[in-house]
């Protein structure tokens, strides 16, 4: 996709989320949303607009989490943001993705494991990455059949912050203060 845009005169910029890949962060990982993504998006948009290679017009696009973060950035109203194109981004993670209908959506189990592969807390530990990849992803069906889970007993235990997120998703059946901060609820 970046090539398509570059061939048409656009600059394509990708920003890593906090605590993923080599971005800043304290290792705390929010699978869905967090309180600072809108602020980070605002700062990035305004930084891009100030670059000599930019005409001052910035647009955002993406699906899933990229849809969520562009909505969060747009809510801050950065002056150089001209357009957003969010695709498949839920406005309330609790209601429309993680616990639709009340029970934990099983796809969230593997999604959190997928995101662990780029989490700062294990990125430099090959054994931990392999434990997550082999145990949590390759054997996901077997793990899901072992429910109920307990902290410290799942392959994600090598990434404590993500394990905490997994168990918050797993145990928190009612919408509460944790879900409110995790969702950054945008439901009208």
Question: Residues of each region from the PLM?
Answer:
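Catalytic nucleophile serine of serine hydrolases
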Residues: 23, 64-65, 88
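Cap/lid segment of the alpha/beta-hydrolase catalytic domain
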Residues: 1-49, 105
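Accessory cap/linker subdomain of secreted extracellular hydrolases
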Residues: 1-2, 7, 75-188
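Short glycine-enriched nucleophile-adjacent loop
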Residues: 65-78
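Alpha/beta-hydrolase fold nucleophile elbow
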Residues: 52-65
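The substrate-binding groove and active-site-proximal loops of carbohydrate-active enzymes
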Residues: 26-35, 58, 112-121
